[in-house]
Amino acid sequence: EMIRLEVVLRNIAAGSLAKRLGMEVGTTLPAPILEFYYKSDALGDPLLNEYHVRALGLASSEELRAIRETTFRANGVLLPFFAEREILLADFKLEFGRQKGALLVGDELTPDGCRFWDRTTRENLGKDRARRSLAREATAYQEIFRRVCT
């Protein structure tokens, strides 16, 4: 059973965060920001806080604690992994689900769900680049693959 939340962790201001708060795109955040979005096409996937999540019955306090810990732990592993490959991880999203009472990550990390930038040029390597055209999507995936696997 998937939880109807997208969990977004942001290390660098970009996308909706930069727009919503009037921040300059590319600003390194002094601390990562964790956001929750309600997965509802009808409502436009609104931003929620933890009180909303609990009030809507989407996740318990214990599940939210585990989601926070897992997401921050993933960030702690991913940041140095990508930095060694000259990639900045601006942000990424995770989704979670439940199986037999256990909370599980129910999503994968791909350029579609991550905002990757070249560490030196800050060129988009992930979802921003891929969204501009299908032809560039393959190139974006290939560049990430090259850096991760070589």
Tell what function each PLM region has.
Residues 1-91, 98-150:
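Acidic/polar, glycine-anchored loop/turn motif associated with catalytic or activation segments
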